[in-house]
Amino acid sequence: MTDRDDRPGRDAEGKTSANPGRNHGLFTYLGKPKSNMTRRSASRRQFLGAVGAGALGGLAGCANPFESETTEGSGEELSVPSLAQFRGSGTLVEGRPAPGGTSIEDLPDLSGSLNIYMGGGEGGIYERFIEMLEEIYPEFTGFTDDAPSSSQAQSIVEAVQSGGSQADVFWSIDAASLGYVAENDAYEPLAAEALEPVPEDFQGADGSWVGVAGRARSVPYNTETIEESEIPEKVAEFPETAALQGTMGWAPTYGAFKSFVTAMRLQKGAETTRQWLESMRNAGTERYPNEYVVTQAVADGELTAGFANHYYAMRVKNQRPDAPLDLAFTSGDAGALVNVAGILQIEGTEKDALITDFVRHLLSAEAQEFFATVSYAYPMIPGVEPVGGLPTVDELNPPEIDLADLSDLEPTLELMSEAGVSG
């Protein structure tokens, strides 16, 4: 296996279709939403006009068909930004219908403060959304403490076990960290209203946490060197696929890759997983520092395919719209894992009502549209579509595992080391 850890690159961390060919789709990276607020008079249910595929202008430069609307709260008039201001910009956002789900304007006002342990934060995107909520609700403040999810999870557990945490909620980039806090009984169950919009597959046991944004494992591939039909639907077949010998890349040090291997271990067992890792290494799979660089190498033609979260291909396409890059998805195995960023209420907080309303805002139509079009995440509520022709969560076929079990990482690290693919 060739080691490419010294390559330069940016660190971006973070059911199959009835058609025999798997669903895939790419879309361009979306710009920062505008922060100015205007009054809304048009219906949130309107559709944006369709535009030609060659159009280059985003919503940010167009007349806004979704004017902002005011709500009454705490004796004051509050201004809710227009839907377009929650959206990113880009050609594939144009023509998107208004999302379904509950609008912010139909939710209780936020008032008070929350101490939020942010695990990850997707490059500041989550903080940006909190700032938008603070603009809507002058009486609300979200104080964030940003650190890696695993570190935050350990800090929360230690604080609760020693007498109490100063934080109210944990917003984690992955389910493994949420699962760790839940396993150690450092949480309080979320209210039913906060859980209701999200499918049970993306909730913790006993309502311990709820997903707010999803990401799917995928196989970015170079369309000039391989056909999608040549890519197996099971990762177990990759080591023996001739077209992929010596032409694939991965990033074993990356947290998302470790979760992928953990999912395989939980589903197939440690020995089968070790053998697969060794087979992929022996097949010449090249090592890279992160999955963004893997995806760049695929687009460059340096690799035929790789293993990466779905949104890295979207970021590459933003920079290089004509890059010969697309996505394939495996079926029913670890290669099809859908992980989530989610929210957990920390044991000992006395802000139950505010936390419930805060989580409901994260699952609002506007928030889910924001996460889908700005961070390219999979929406967690049925009424919002993923961007760019990606298969919906329902069309993907992830492995049947409890996402919280991804927190059991130590055995994964041991077998990766034994296989010569240390993280």
Regions found by a protein language model. Name each.
Residues M1, A42-G61:
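N-terminal export leaders
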Residues M1-A42:
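N-terminal secretory signal peptides
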Residues A63-T71:
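Bacterial lipoprotein signal-peptidase II cleavage site
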Residues F86-I173, G179:
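Early extracytoplasmic/lumenal segment of secretory-pathway proteins
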Residues N115, G119-E127, S150, S165-E302:
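Extracytoplasmic ligand-binding site segments that recognize negatively charged/polar headgroups
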Residues T272, P289-G348, E385-V387:
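Extracytoplasmic/periplasmic substrate-binding proteins
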Residues A341-L403:
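Mature extracytoplasmic/periplasmic domains
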Residues D405-G423:
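Conserved C-terminal helix/tail region of periplasmic/extracytoplasmic solute-binding proteins
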